[in-house]
Amino acid sequence: MELNHKWIQVIGIGDDGMASLTQALIKLVLNADLLVGGERHLAFFPQFQKDKIDIKGPLSTVVDRIKQEGLGKRVVVLASGDPNFFGIGPYLVKQFGSSEVEILPNLSSIQLVCARSNESWHDATWISLHGRSMTGLAQRVQAADKVLIVTDPMNTPSAIARYLLAYEMNEYEAFIGEHLGGPNEKTGWYTLEQLIDGTFAELNIVLLKRVHNVVSHYPLGVDDEQFSQRKPDRGLITKREIRVLSLAQLQLQPGHVLWDIGACTGSVSIEAILHTPLLRVYAIEKNADDLINLRENQVKFRTDFVAVNGRAPAGLDEFEDPNAVFIGGSGGELKELLQLCAQRLRAGGRIVVNAATIETLATAYETLRSLQFTVSVSLVQTARSKAILQLTRFEGMNPVYLVTGVQSENGDGDHGE
């Protein structure tokens, strides 16, 4: 192996320690002036008696220490498997520059778990729950037939199984790889039910594979009747035609944050996530009964997002700043609500208001203009066919004004017409 002479080498190491390294890499470690790694990795080299940094706490602290103690020296950083796969590699390259860092990977845990399970990994979705919340996992798993999950002591195989079963996702089986590549390696297939009470080593990888066919994709424009709704007031839902046009105006992208204010049944949030699974959604609904229906719909459509009972603008302080805001109901406080949303909206963001009355239209239009948004309005009048005996007629639906406000990339906008 030909090694470059960059002053920071990041070496991937397996669960079997030195046995996973070539002689050239072992020599590189032992000749370093400063050895950096987690306690477990440093313990693989008891013969190394020079300076060490134990990776604990924020990575920024580790970087500061490398700059202070390692400048002008040969620095080796030990990392699990492939340092570029949900590892420390990209962070160090970003902090020190590509010209200063060399990545020397080992077999990744993903490669090993797929080898042990005889599964390919080029067609899998990869998710890391290491140090992350499980919120949003349902829709990401739902969108894939095969999922590889990096876990942590909180997000264990058992916790993942309980989470998925709460969304009735029992069409998956799981392959668990523990201490892969090490002397204590253990692997096996499990049903999700079998995982619930299982105990697994802290070092593990979860492979989920869909083994039963279910409805995993919904076309744009889910029928209103598929959503649980409050009865007898079944009209309290953003109708399919209006929902689709509103989502088009929001122009959502993966990684965006959406606020759904006056969420009611959650139809807008749910359909947004179905077509943009990496969306992060925060919904608020003042009616507790509607929130019950919303949660039923979350389970049915396997969409996990934050939904709270409250009357906006109260409660919005707990939400991430949004890229887009949908307002389906304001409880008579639209002006104040729009002002707060404009303050929190990220540059270039959008606000879409569904207005059923001229008064709501006027308030939305004038307030957004006063806030320097570029404003446009669409009047949507639709009708659905309805059978009468052997004939068919159209039954008109209530007209809805779609008011769209767009903020410029520098936080302001031009007045609309």
Question: What residue ranges belong to the model's regions?
Answer:
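Conserved SAM-binding loop
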Residues: 294-295
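Conserved SAM-binding loop of SAM-dependent methyltransferases across substrates and taxa
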Residues: 265-277
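A contiguous loop/helix-start segment that scaffolds small-molecule binding in enzyme catalytic cores
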Residues: 2-10, 22-26, 74-75, 146-234, ...
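S-adenosylmethionine
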Residues: 286-287, 291, 307-384
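Conserved class I S-adenosyl-L-methionine
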Residues: 255-264
